[in-house]
């Protein structure tokens, strides 16, 4: 049994990671300040004797705070909303960069063997031209085209993590997530994840909103496949001083209009009583036209590959969200 420390454990990805580790016999300590996470995401594991939770902010964690030693630190906490970071740049830097530095120091004091970091595929957002996709981990951002503030904070944190890990003998693995979706994703954001946004609008008898033409293409990965990705990363961790980056995606991409069609079809399959139609609004600034991850490195190094097709993943997500809505109405 290994001992893990997870930041952002009450978030969408963090709570799923905690559950995956616990199901595989691991011990987990998690923190969250509930700025983006929700208590309901961890209610089912709070009584697990192998799980301990503290309501804490990553910026307030003391390096030698008495939590004990850990085999792995998973740093997932961040201000992740692109437009929130644009409008609150000081806070984005404070949390995403300075907070990450604080957790690195914590990992060193906790004698952690490995530090895992939730990086972002938004670092590829300014790579122009369909011929340059899918993007590999070695592809560099276009220095002549500006990136969004969220991507910049993640890039800065990534550089510190690699350098700090090498200097202090901590192995580091960085995950560049694409669009992660599934049950318990955060639907309270100003602009929620597209699969959840479409689903909620249809459930509520409203018309889904698409920004721009709907022709932008995105790489989507279901949370169940991300769970197996994370555990493969842990089981295949390298020497203590090693530093690696891996793309976390499905390796394909889909037009937003196609996602809307698949969500609509999934709603029809469960007789959710939805109606068609789309509301088009002006395009959001500084958004990539294409995202598509080259996932051959994870396949080669870990033998990992996503199992769910986009249709299967959306069907499963819509069914689960419909079930959760029914349970909420019954309570």
Where are these regions (language model features)?
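N-terminal Rossmann-like NAD(P)+-binding domain of SDR-like oxidoreductases, especially those catalyzing
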Residues: 1-180, 304, 316, 320, ...
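Residue-level signal for the nucleotide or nucleotide-sugar donor/cofactor binding architecture
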Residues: 37, 87, 95-98, 148, ...
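Flexible interhelical turns and helix-capping residues at alpha-helix boundaries
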Residues: 35, 78, 188, 238-241, ...
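NAD(P)-dependent short-chain dehydrogenase/reductase
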Residues: 127-134, 159-218, 223-235, 251-253, ...
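Short helix-coil transition/hinge motifs at the ends and kinks of transmembrane helices
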Residues: 129-141, 187, 240, 269-274
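C-terminal substrate-binding subdomain of Rossmann-fold SDR/epimerase-dehydratase oxidoreductases
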Residues: 3-4, 57, 102, 203-331
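Alpha-helix N-cap/helix-start and coil->helix boundary motif
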Residues: 28, 35-36, 60, 90, ...
């Amino acid at each position: 049994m290994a001992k893990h420390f997870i930041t952002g454990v009450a978030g969408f990805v963090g709570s799923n990671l905690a559950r995956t580790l616990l199901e595989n016999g691991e011990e987990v300590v998690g923190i969250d300040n509930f700025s983006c996470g929700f208590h309901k995401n961890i209610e089912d594991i709070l009584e697990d004797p192998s799980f301990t939770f503290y309501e804490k902010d990553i910026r307030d964690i003391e390096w030698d705070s008495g939590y004990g030693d850990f085999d792995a630190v998973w740093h997932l906490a961040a201000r992740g909303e692109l437009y929130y970071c644009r409008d609150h740049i000081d806070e984005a830097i404070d949390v995403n960069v300075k907070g990450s530095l604080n957790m690195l120091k914590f990992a060193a004091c906790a004698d952690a063997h490995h530090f895992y970091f939730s990086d972002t595929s938004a670092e590829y957002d300014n790579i122009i031209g369909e011929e340059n996709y899918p993007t590999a981990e070695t592809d560099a951002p276009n220095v002549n085209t500006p990136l969004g503030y969220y991507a910049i904070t993640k890039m800065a944190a990534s550089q510190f993590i690699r350098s700090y890990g090498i200097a202090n003998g901590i192995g580091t693995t960085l995950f560049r997530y694409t669009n992660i979706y599934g049950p318990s994703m955060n639907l309270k954001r100003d602009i929620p994840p597209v699969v959840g946004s479409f689903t909620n609008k249809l459930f509520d008898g409203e018309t889904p909103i698409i920004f721009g033409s709907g022709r932008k293409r995105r790489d989507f990965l279901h949370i169940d496949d991300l769970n197996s990705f994370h555990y493969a990363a842990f089981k295949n961790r390298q020497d203590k001083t090693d530093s690696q980056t891996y793309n976390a995606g499905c390796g394909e991409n889909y037009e937003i209009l196609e996602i809307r069609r698949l969500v609509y079809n999934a709603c029809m399959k469960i007789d959710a009583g939805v109606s068609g139609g789309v509301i088009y609004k002006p395009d959001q600034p500084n958004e990539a036209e294409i995202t598509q991850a080259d996932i051959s490195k994870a396949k080669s190094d870990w033998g990992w590959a996503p199992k769910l097709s986009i249709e299967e993943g959306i069907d499963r997500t819509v069914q689960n969200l419909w079930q959760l809505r029914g349970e909420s109405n019954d309570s």
